[in-house]
């Protein structure tokens, strides 16, 4: 019985290798990624873009609902609140917007507050860096720049 157990366990033991002191430096050192900041964006214009784009995305993805206007405005207000508190990196703003939107979110919406906060962060990343995740429902950076121009200012 013990021999049979060893036949099954012995190969699995070799799968667990102790860390090597000779491992490449890339594996030993933590990866530092600089946060994306929104300091170059015009906050008033960015808030308008967030409100309009979020409302349009919700109308497009689901059905047109009056609560989408409220959600868009609440997201814009939460963004402005984050900026007023001095938050300038997208991660901190995402956290702030999500927390603010959970306090008073329309019950008739088909999405949740964190879905909307994630859309806001995707929009901010596209505006601030020009980058966009392919899985994002946020418009491209070029589309967002055109929308910002409609509101009277360039964002970057």
Which residues does each predicted region cover?
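N-terminal plastid-targeting presequences
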Residues: 16-156
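N-terminal chloroplast transit peptides
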Residues: 1-24
